[in-house]
Regions:
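Catalytic pocket-lining loop regions of alpha/beta-barrel enzymes
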Residues: 118, 122-124, 151-152, 166-281, ...
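Mid-to-C-terminal alpha-helical segments outside catalytic/metal-binding sites
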Residues: 25-75, 91-95, 276-281, 287-334
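Conserved, mostly hydrophobic/aromatic
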Residues: 31, 97, 153, 177, ...
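Sec-dependent signal peptide recognition
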Residues: 1-9
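Short, acidic/polar
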Residues: 88-93, 133-144
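Divalent metal-dependent hydrolysis catalytic cores, especially in the metallo-beta-lactamase
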Residues: 45, 49-86, 92-109, 124-129, ...
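Active-site environment of divalent metal-dependent phosphoester hydrolases
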Residues: 35-37, 111-114, 133-136, 159-161, ...
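Aromatic-lined substrate-binding rim segments of carbohydrate-active enzymes
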Residues: 87-101, 105-119, 162-186
Length: 334
């Protein structure tokens, strides 16, 4: 009679072991968004994965014609479509987190971030995106941090407001991040092409120079910071900054799926060949198109110049080190 419980226990253990073996290895997505389905226009907008060639604009025609070809009805082999409702987008985000065993640094409006965090608390690192709209007060940020709802400061989107990364208006946020040991995620580089004409009139590409961070880094030597989009297309400046400031990391958000694959791989290889493969972190920049996660992962996995170990570093190890995560995926110091 005692044999039956023993067999049941062995069977349960075997099933658990098989489940663990079948589970995908964890991936850290340093550039994930939690937002409403209409955050980037009417629900159901599209993005190409990848574009190629980029849509061109005839300035004699209304900007709506360009926007249609860019994100409403783009002509590409693989258009990704956004879900119709906030609930559908949240559900798809949670499904992706579970399917790919993601630890997602999720930024966006605080209520959307909190909704995602409450749904998958063990796999979501809550962050706050701001910079091109009303700015949160330092008191508000301290309160979010005290509640455990602010563990990364960013995505800082000041570039969309025409504000350079070394602008004095950002200084209080850098100082707070250093004080609280909050990693900073800053947007430097590409927005949607042509965004200055239809969605972000303040955006200027000239504010994409990573070296603009240099004096700030000297004022805040203990600050953890990563440059989103790997500073594309400013490869020389990005390499120079990482060389001179060994604490600076980058993520691969959006350039790993929306950009022509040859361009992304050439840019990624440039950073790796320059000796910075251990400071490159995977980021999907999933906004309102959940399938962007799969497309972004393909961008890394298809890079034949990377070894399996280098891919694993980009997909997990580098970010785990930067975030100071323990073996269980939880923060060691926060």
């Amino acid at each position: 009679m005692q044999l039956l419980p023993l067999l049941a226990a062995v069977a349960a253990q075997a099933t658990t072991s098989q489940a663990v073996q079948a589970a995908p290895v964890p991936i850290i997505d340093m550039h994930f968004h939690a937002m409403g389905a209409d955050a980037l226009g009417p629900p159901g907008s599209k993005i190409c994965a990848p574009y190629g060639p980029w849509p061109r604009r005839d300035p004699a025609k209304a900007i709506d014609e360009y926007v249609k070809r860019f994100t409403i009805a783009p002509d590409c082999a693989r258009p990704l479509t956004g879900p119709p409702t906030d609930k559908a987008l949240l559900r798809a985000n949670v499904e992706n987190i579970r399917r790919y065993n993601l630890i997602a640094v999720a930024s966006g409006p605080s209520h959307h971030v909190e909704a995602l965090y409450r749904t998958a608390p063990s796999q979501v690192i809550p962050a706050l995106s701001f910079g091109d709209g009303p700015l949160p007060s330092i008191i508000e940020l301290r309160q979010l941090h005290a509640k455990g709802l602010l563990k990364v400061l960013g995505e800082l989107t000041f570039q969309y407001a025409g504000i350079a990364p070394d602008d004095p208006r950002i200084e209080p946020y850098y100082a707070l991040a250093e004080e609280l040991d909050l990693p900073v995620a800053i947007h430097i580089g590409p927005g949607p092409p042509g965004i200055s004409y239809f969605g972000g009139p303040g955006y200027r590409m000239r504010h994409s120079d990573p070296l603009a961070l240099e004096e700030m880094l000297m004022r805040h030597p203990k600050l953890r910071i990563y440059v989103m989009h790997a500073g594309w297309p400013m490869g020389d400046a990005m390499i120079a900054l990482m060389y001179a400031h060994p604490q600076v990391y980058v993520d691969t958000g959006v350039i790993d799926y929306a950009f022509p694959r040859a361009e992304f791989h050439a840019y990624l290889k440039r950073l790796v060949d320059a000796g910075f493969g251990d400071r490159i972190m995977f980021g999907s920049d999933q906004m309102v198109w959940p399938d962007a996660v799969a497309a972004a992962l393909e961008g890394i996995e298809s890079a034949e110049f990377l070894t399996a170990a280098q891919k694993r570093d980009i997909l997990y190890n580098n970010a785990a080190r930067f975030l100071r995560l323990g073996k269980d995926g939880k923060a060691e110091t926060q």
